[in-house]
Amino acid sequence: MKVVNLLLLASVACAVHAQVQIKPLPEKGFEKRIHNAVYDIRLIDTHEHLMSEKQALSGASDFTCLFENYQNCDMTSSNLLANIPSASHWENISTAWEAAKSTGYGRASLLAAKELFDIDDLNADTHEELSARIKASHKPGYYTYVLKEKAKIDMVITMVGSNAETSHEDKSFFKSLMYTNGFCYLSDEFNKYTFSFERARTFHNKFSNDVRTLSDYEEMMDKAFRAGIGKGIIGFKNSWCYSRTMQTEEVSRENAEKIFNRMVADPKREFTLDEVKPLQDYLFFKVLSLCEKYGMPIQIHTGLQTYNGNYITNTNPTLLTNVFFKFPKVKFILLHAAYPYGGELAALAKNFPNVYIDLAWAPIICPSYSIRYLQEFLETVPSNKISVFGGDVSSVEGTYGASVMAREVVEKCLVAMVRSGYFTEKEATVLANKLLRENAIRMYDLKL
């Protein structure tokens, strides 16, 4: 009976992973050949929050630099952080780390510890040695070693603020996307849910000291976008789903102007989100019209938010459907495989020519989700519209770990699809290059 049950389980597992066979089955050794092809690719990194090397080398130079990339969120989620004032940092986090190191974030941290510093695990016996090796490595040239030599990255796209200023010196290697949140949200303070013109003024005074009307505000936005383009940005980014729903309605200029004028007339009054949402929606449409005007793509955060405690339903990509219709000439690049809304994302990218998929961050959120949905994306969406790698982290150690996991996601997905006869080995190697490099170059019109 036990043997029968095992055979039944095996047959069910095979059925789950089986695909329609289109091509001849591969020749022996194809797994290794695909592995080698994937790891030979020079990557394009489509989404990072990296500080400059100078800033990084003046910051944390111990094992905690591995936790700058979301690991703290999982340790907080474990509800096991000690937070004992008299304890050492390791004593405070060790129990939570032991629980959280099983997650994708934890695995990425361990990959970095192993591959960059030759430490197999982070525990009570190794954390001091790991810190010593990290400190010894943090010297000029470290970014080149980790990003270009170890991770084999040819270009990194970083996020910059609404002033489009970047601290990275190597402008040929680091490209930038400019945040648009503040223009729509009327504030850079995304943890606030009331709005005043007085605080909005703090934001827009960066670009113009003479904003009194909605027309002035719109002119300020255009000026800021032109300034960003002049500084070399290659696109824009929106992630206001951390603070509100992505659902927007088309609002008349007249109604938006009424709200704007009320805020100007009573600048210290705190307006609720419900009161200002129509104005915010109008301004989001303005952002998209500027993307269209200047021929720039926009990345939009979809799916899981970082930090602890969020409204995940604010991030469902289907909430953006009306803007895909409204702005058919704007290239929308939807981020993070929309975890956990992968099916919805696939349907949108299949239906709309202007909707693209970027799995950035997803391989370290959940590797199995990324493998599963990459397969689904390849079966439903034209392959030129999918990009896989973006670390979405603030330290190069995190970028390295994410790069390895992104390669593994691509490798495991393609090996499974070749094994079943859906793709040939040759098709898989071509696709790997598209997923990890060529598609990103075309999506962002990169010049290497």
Label the predicted regions.
Residues 42-43, 154-157, 173-177, 233-237, ...:
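Structural preference for beta-strand elements that scaffold enzyme active sites
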Residues 25, 319-322, 329-448:
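H/E-rich (His + Asp/Glu) clusters that bind or coordinate divalent metals
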Residues 32-39, 166-168, 218-236, 282-293, ...:
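Short amphipathic alpha-helices and their capping/turn segments at secondary-structure boundaries
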Residues 10-13:
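N-terminal signal peptide c-region/cleavage motif recognized by signal peptidases
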